[in-house]
Amino acid sequence: SNSILPGVTVQIVCDGKSVKAIAADLNGHFEIEVGGYEMCNLEFSFVGFLTESFSISEIRSPLKVRLKDKTQALGLAVVSGSISERAVEEEVVPIEVLKPYLADNTNAVGLKGLVAKTSGVAIMDSQVSIRGGSGYSYGVGSRVSLLLDGLPLLSGDLGEIWWSYLPMEHIAQVEVIKCAASSLYGTGASNGVIHFRSVWPSSKKETIVKAFNGVYSDPQNESWRWWDDSFSPVLNGASVSHRQAWDKVDLVVGGNVMSDKTYLSTGHEQRARLSAKLRFRPANGLLYGVSAIAQYQQMGRFILWDDFETSAYLPMDGTSSEDKWFNMNIDPWLTFSDKSGGSHKLKTRFYRTARFNPSGSISMASNLYMGEYKYGREFNEHISAQVGTFLSIQSSFSSLYPGVSLLTFNPAVFGQIEGHHGRLRTVLGARFENNLNPGFYDESSGPVLRAGLNYEIRKGTNFRASIGQSYRFASIAEKYFSTNLTDGIDVIGNIDLQSESGLNLEAGIKHKVMFGDKVVYLDAAVFMLEYEDMIEYTLRPQLDSTGGIIIDDGVLQFFFQALNIGKSRIAGFEWSANGEMKVAGIPVRVFGGATFQYAGDLSRDTSQINMGAYIDNFLDSFGDTRDSLVTAGSLLKYRNSGNFKLDIEADFGPLTVGGSIIRQDYIDDIDWYFNELVSGLANFREQFTEGFASLDARLVYNAADNAKFSFIVSNLKNEVMSSRPGILSAPRSMVFRFDYKF
C-alpha cells in the first residue's frame, strides 16, 4: 500500500545466522553498516508481512523496501494480547479476528451484530457474555471490556457497552479475547475483551459510500403485529468514509445516519454520527494525532413484553421509555521511539455520555477522563518488556444517585515481560489497580497476575496455555441506581457490593491450514473460569415483617438488585474455524465454531466445590438431567449450555453467495418469580426447551466500476427467537444495500 511501516527488523544474516540487527524508526527509516558482510544477506521482517531478503553485494544505498501484507495473504495479525503486533497463532490467549468483509456483506450496522457471530459469545439484549462468564444485568456493569483503538470505552457510570457508537464505516478489524484480560486492561475485562481497531489510509485516496433500505416481515403469530396493512416496520441508513494520506499527514473522516422503526412498538432507534482521525508523521521517530466521535441518538427501551400469546411486541405497562442520548469522545495521543530502541506511547481520552429528559434538560450524564502511558523495549531477540501507568477519573450526575453526583478515581500500574526462545514464547504480566470514591469507598484489586506460553509443535501448529487472575469493581449504577421499573417492580442499588475476583485457565491448539496463498485457522480449546463474590442481578420479593410478600393496591411487590452471589465455576470446550480457502478453484471464506459450557453455581449447590462432584455434574449435563440440575440449584442463572455458529460465503466471479446459521441452546435457569410477573413467560419457556436456530442468506454482486449491490435476508425462516426472557428477537428482515468506492 506504500504506507510507512515503523518497527521493521533489519538484520544481516550470514549462513542462516543473524549477526547484526536494528529496528526501523517510526518513519520507516533505518541505517545499518554492512561493510565486511558483502557475502551475506540483508533481511527485512515484521509480524504480519512476508520477509524480504537481498544480497548485500547487489544492493545500493539508499534502499527502499516494500513488504507484502501477510495478514491478507498468509494469516492474521493481532495487537490485543501482547506488547506488539503478532501473528494470531503465536498468542498465548484465545483471540478471534473479525474482518471488514463480514461487517459489509452482512450489513452489520452496529458492532453487536458483528460480534454476535463469534463462537462462544452470547449477547442477551445488549449484555455480552464470553464462554458463559456473564448472565444478564439489565444494561449496567459488564465483565467484557470494549476497547476503541487501545483504550477502554465503557460508559463511566453504567459500565455498559454502547454498541451503536462504534464507527463501523471505519472498521479495520475486531479482535475478541476469550479469556480474562484484567492484567492488561483492568476492571471490566474479567470475562474478555472486544477490541475495535479503526482504519488508517493507504497511499491511495479513497472514499466509500454505503446506503441500505430494509423491511421487517410480519411475525408468525399475527396477534403480535401492532401495525396495520398501511405500514411495515422499516430500517434504513447511509454512511461515508474518506481516507487520505499526504506526505506526513493522514486523515480519516466519515459519518453515519440510521433509522430503525423496528418491530417492537417502543424499540425505535434513530442516530446520526460524525467521526474523524488525524495523524502526523514528522521526522525523528515522533508520531502524534487526535481522533474524535460525536453521536446523537433517539432510542426506545423495551424491557418486558405485555403478553407472549397476544401482544409480545407491545411492552408491559411501565417497562418502556423513550431516551435521547448524546455521546462523544476526543482522543489525543502520541508515540515516540528513542535512540536506545525504546517505545513511548501516551494515549488519552475524554468520553461523555448524556441522557436528556422529554423537556430537553439533562437527566443523567457521565464524563470519563483517562490516560495511559506505556514504555516498551525489545532488549534482544529473546526478551521484550513493557511497563505503564493508567488513570481514569469519572464524574457522574443523576437524580437517581445519592447526592445527585459522584466522583471516582481508578489509578493503575502494570507491566509485562515476554520471552522468545526457539519455538517457545512465554508471557508474564501483572497489574495493580485502585478504585476510589471519596466519602463512600476505597478498594484495591491487589496484584493481578497472568502467565502464558505458546509452543510451535510443528510448522503451522501451535499449542497455547494460560492462567490469569481477574477482578471487577462494581459499577456506580450497581451500587447506587434506584428507580421504579413498573407497578410491582423496583430497581434498588446495593452500596454493600464487594468487588468480584476470578481465575481463568485455558489451553488450546491452533492449526494453520494453507490453501496456496489462503489460510484457514482451526482452533480447539478447553477452559475453566472461577469467580469469587460474583455480582449478578437477582429478582426478589419485597417482604413485610412476617416474611410475606408485600401487596400494594393488589399488586405483589418485587425488586431487582445486584448481589454478590458467591462462588461459581464455568468450564467447557470449544472449536472454531476462521479464514479463507479455495475449493475447486472457488474462493470460500468461513467463520464460526461451537461451544459447550457448564456454568456451576457453587454457592447454591455447595457440593460442587468438590471438583469431583463438579465434574460429575459437568458430564451429566450432556444428557437429559439438566432439569434436575436446575432443581438442585446447580446452574448459574441466565446461561445456556452452548451455541453453534457458522458464516460461510463463496465467490463465483462477480457474485458472492453467503449465509449463516446460529444455534443457541435453551436458557436453563432464571429467577422463577419471572414466570409469575411476565405474562406468558412460563408457556414460552415450555414451548422452546430445545433453544433457537436462525438462518440468514445473502447475495452480493460486485460490479466492475467499484459498485456493489447486496440483498440480505436475516431470519430466513421467520423463526420465533429470544435472546433473554421477556423479549423476542426480530422476525424476518430483508435489506437492499448499495456500496460505491471512489
Where are these regions (language model features)?
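Short acidic/polar hinge/loop motifs at secondary-structure boundaries
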Residues: 117, 151-180, 230
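Membrane-embedded beta-barrel scaffold of Gram-negative outer-membrane proteins
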Residues: 345-355, 464, 498-559, 563, ...
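Gram-negative outer-membrane beta-barrel transporters
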Residues: 210, 527-530, 556-673
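Short, acidic, small-residue-rich periplasmic hinge/interaction motif at the N-terminus
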Residues: 8-13, 43-49, 60-104
